[in-house]
Each structure stands twice: as structure tokens, then as C-alpha cells.
A protein has these predicted regions:
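Juxtamembrane low-complexity tails/linkers enriched in Ser/Thr-Pro and polybasic
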Residues: 1-11
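N-terminal "mature-domain start" segment
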Residues: 9-126, 154, 176, 183-253, ...
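Short, solvent-exposed coil/turn segments at beta-strand boundaries
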Residues: 78, 170-176, 252, 292-294, ...
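Short, surface-exposed beta-strand/loop micro-motifs that present aromatic residues
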Residues: 112-119, 164-171, 241-249, 297-298, ...
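Short, well-ordered beta-strand elements
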Residues: 128-129, 174-182, 255-258, 313-321
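Long, charged/polar, surface-exposed segments that mediate recognition or autoinhibition
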Residues: 134-150, 154-155, 193-204, 260-282, ...
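A cross-kingdom feature marking solvent-exposed beta-strand/loop segments within repeated
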Residues: 142-168, 178-179, 183-186, 278-305
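C-terminal soluble interaction/assembly domains
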Residues: 260-349
Length: 351
């Protein structure tokens, strides 16, 4: 009886392993079928990876709470509010930030709440907090990235943050935040940092993951150079949102870009639309000899080289490069990155 039980258990294990092997083989066949039929979407893979890496921090507070309340809660030690928070809407935003309002309004602006904190017993020493509710994290990242100051230094405060001598700038959830002091001093620098940390720690937000960011290789990409254009990138109105980043290739700095195109015709149709647009502006299409990138288009815009191509539903390219060979090399790097990711995800099967 004991021997029979052992034999039965051994047989059960063998059957289980055999079943797993069959299921694995069926999965490989299914992926291959999707690839052949054009049904595999590399972006769904990246989206899944991003979802796995994103976490929600447990908290009793939320960045969805009243902006005025948030400002009151981030008061640093040794400082006090100089009054009540000011609130600005679409109609009054330009009263506070004259000359810069259009960018915010185009990126989903909801409201701005501002509050000045003054040093106790020394009201001439102060800093002001600008809390922009942009409605969604991608909108907050867009305004953060597009107007990032060239003299800014990347900060470890938050994933997307930087500092200048008298200020700190960062995005957090749906908010884009600026904290600007009246002068440069250690006291104000410490107060601003404390206030920013109070906001981040007391009002945690869901981790921000931008799909387009994962579609561009990190290798040779300059940290903090990314910019998100929600519309009209490079003056082309038909573009969906476009992410750009600066790369160093062959000792040259160049701008790469990526856009996910889900409309009629997808990325392939967008490549043709953009080609026609550039030629309409006076661009000259140049023949590309022996490119490793299928369907690559190169347009000479009076010395500025525009290179672009599509892979799946993504349009990728190099914008306004001065060195043709370096631009072609970077385009090949972009294409290789996407195809390598695809092959890795499908067990070596080609795109």
C-alpha cells in the first residue's frame, strides 16, 4: 500500500510537470500568432512593467485635498503665513504670473493657490509657495519639464525636482510646485526644503509613470532633459503628445522624440503626415543609404536634419540635428532598443 501511494504521488508530479510544459508551449504559440497577425502591442508590455513598478503610499491625507489646506500644513518651523492663501483661476491666472499663463492654460490648468511665509520677528525674510493644480500628473510634468530653467540643478527631493539659488521646483501628483525665496540665504534654503518635505511626506501621491519615458533608452540620455509636449510639438498640430529627451551621441548632443499614435492609420500614417508637413515648410527629403531602420525618413530643413520612423504604434525620431551621421546612429539606437525589448518579451521571437 505504501509503495503504491509513493508511485501515485510520483506519477502526479510527472503529470503536473507535463501539463506545465504543454501550457508553456501553448503560450509561446499564442504570442507567435499575435505577432504574425500584428496583434502584439509592445506598449502594453511597457505599461505592464510600469504598473508593477508603481506603488501607492498609504496615508491619511491625499493630494486631492484642499490646496489651501495643503499650504497651511506645510508651514516650516520658525515661519508663519503672512495672510490667507490666494486663489487664481483661468480668468485671473495672468494677474499673478503675467506672460507665462498661456502654457499652464494649454496644459489643463485648474487653479493656482499661493501663500507667503515670513520669518517670525523678521517679516522681510520670506518665501512664497505656488501650488498649481494641473488636473493630472502628466499635465503637471508637462509644465514642469517645458519651463525647467537652464541654470537648474537636479535635486534628490523628488523624482522630478530641481533647484536654483533661491528656489525649488518639483511635480507631485497632479501638482506642479514652485517655492521661491526673497533672497539667497541658508535660513531660507532650509525653510524651503523643510516646507517641500512636509508636502511630500504629509501628502503622498501615487507613483508617476509616463509610458513614453520607458520607450526611450536611458543609455546616453541626459538626466532631467526630458520634456513633454501635450500638443503642437515642433509646430505640428496633428501630433499627439510628444516626449523629447537630449542624448549625447558621437560627442554631439541631439534631441530624440517619441509619440504614441492611436488614431486612424496609427504611427505609419503619422510618419507620412509629418513628412508632408516638413516638405511644405521647405524641407528636402534625402535618400538614406542602407539604413538598419525600416521605413526611416530623413528631411533636410536648411541644414537641420529631421529623422523619423515608426515601429508598432510609436513614432520615433531625431529633431533638428546638425550632424547627419550622429543622428542616424542615434535613430538606430532607438530602433534597436524597442526591437530588443520586443524580442526579449517574446522569448526571442522577432517583431
Amino acid at each position: 500500500m505504501t509503495m503504491n501511494n509513493k508511485q501515485n504521488r510520483g506519477g502526479g508530479r510527472a503529470e503536473t510537470l507535463y501539463s506545465i510544459a504543454i501550457l508553456f508551449a501553448l503560450a509561446i504559440i499564442a504570442v507567435a500568432f499575435l505577432l504574425v497577425q500584428g496583434g502584439f502591442n509592445i506598449n502594453s508590455l511597457f505599461a505592464t512593467e510600469l504598473q508593477k513598478s508603481s506603488t501607492v503610499h498609504p496615508t491619511t491625507k491625499s493630494v486631492g485635498e484642499s490646496p489651501a489646506q495643503i499650504l497651511q500644513d506645510i508651514q516650516p518651523s520658525g515661519f508663519r503665513p503672512s495672510g490667507s492663501a490666494e486663489t487664481f483661476n483661468n480668468e485671473t491666472l495672468s494677474d499673478k504670473i503675467d506672460g507665462r499663463a498661456d502654457l499652464y492654460l494649454e496644459c489643463g490648468f485648474v487653479n493656482l493657490n499661493a501663500l507667503r511665509f515670513v520669518k517670525e520677528n523678521d517679516p522681510a525674510t520670506w518665501f512664497e509657495v505656488y501650488l498649481y493644480d494641473m488636473g493630472a500628473p502628466e499635465n503637471a510634468f508637462a509644465v514642469y519639464s517645458i519651463q525647467k530653467r537652464k541654470d537648474g540643478k537636479n535635486s534628490n527631493l523628488a523624482l522630478y525636482s530641481y533647484t536654483v539659488e533661491n528656489a525649488i521646483f518639483f511635480m507631485h501628483g497632479k501638482y506642479y510646485t514652485e517655492m521661491v525665496s526673497s533672497e539667497v540665504s541658508d535660513v531660507l534654503k532650509d525653510a524651503i526644503l523643510s516646507s517641500a518635505q512636509n508636502l511630500l511626506e504629509n501628502y503622498p501621491a501615487e507613483a508617476f509613470s509616463l509610458l513614453e519615458m520607458s520607450l526611450l533608452p536611458k543609455d546616453a540620455r541626459l538626466k532631467g532633459s526630458e520634456e513633454l509636449f501635450l500638443k503642437n510639438a515642433f509646430g505640428f498640430e496633428k501630433f499627439p503628445r510628444v516626449l523629447t529627451a537630449i542624448y549625447r551621441q558621437n560627442e554631439k548632443e541631439m534631441m530624440a522624440f517619441v509619440a504614441t499614435c492611436k488614431g486612424a492609420g496609427g504611427a505609419r500614417a503619422m510618419v507620412e503626415e509629418y513628412r508632408i508637413f516638413l516638405i511644405g515648410l521647405g524641407g528636402k527629403e534625402r535618400k538614406v543609404e542602407e539604413s538598419a531602420v525600416p521605413g526611416l525618413v530623413m528631411i533636410d530643413m536648411s541644414g537641420d536634419i529631421e529623422i523619423f520612423f515608426c515601429t508598432g504604434e510609436n513614432l520615433m525620431g531625431i529633431h533638428a540635428a546638425r550632424d547627419k551621421d550622429a543622428a542616424l546612429a542615434l535613430a538606430q539606437k532607438l530602433y534597436k532598443y524597442i526591437t530588443t525589448k520586443t524580442q526579449s518579451a517574446t522569448g526571442g521571437l522577432k517583431e
